[in-house]
Amino acid sequence: IISVKDIATANMDIYETRILAISHTKYTNVLDAIDGTMIVGDSEEEITKGKILIGAANPDLLENYVEDGDMLLTGNRFENQLCGIEMNAGCIVVCTGAPISKTIQKLAKENNCKIISTPHDTLMVARLISQSAPVRYFLKKDHLITFSREDFISDIRDTLAKIRHRDFPVLDRDGKYCGMLSRRSLLNMDNKKIILVDHNEKGQAV
């Protein structure tokens, strides 16, 4: 299960530069997020290692930071693109739709380095690219609050009042998902009404 808060927290986690490798994100997700085009490589492959790195420095400095499998965000600087390939980057993202030379494409193929072209600038790509991580990575699987189809409303009302979730998953006897239960709809339900009758009175007998 995932909440809006979980998604917002994920987008704010700017310090996790290896999010794509940890979540085994497919390159197709990256292409969708940054409106990119795969120039070299297979878009169906998954990212399994490396971090996201902006290649704004000169090659002499950049080579101290690029590691095996990294995704390097660059502009039109040939020397930075070449540095990424030589340092075994897993993918080079060329921003602002800058042209990519045949030499760079050839070297990338020979070194198993993917190349993606995107019309967005480096800042925009850096902000968008983390949103390509699959939802499954953020899903919560433990300590979930669930209800059974056989639960009585009176028994779960206190839980609904304490926990500030909007919806709760409902499971069958086998633990399989059946649907969602709205907290608001249940809290607004009428309480049980009891009518006392005197069966000794003919008019009240059932």
Model-derived regions: residue spans:
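Tandem CBS (Bateman) regulatory domains
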Residues: 3-28, 48, 119-146, 157, ...
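Short, small/polar residue-rich loop motifs at catalytic or cofactor-binding pockets
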Residues: 162-165
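Extracytoplasmic Gram-positive cell-surface binding/anchoring modules and repeats
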Residues: 148-151
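Feature captures the catalytic cores and cofactor-binding loops of soluble hydro-lyases/lyases
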Residues: 54-139
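Gly/Thr-rich phosphate-binding loop signature of adenosyl cofactor/nucleotide-binding cores
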Residues: 10, 17-80
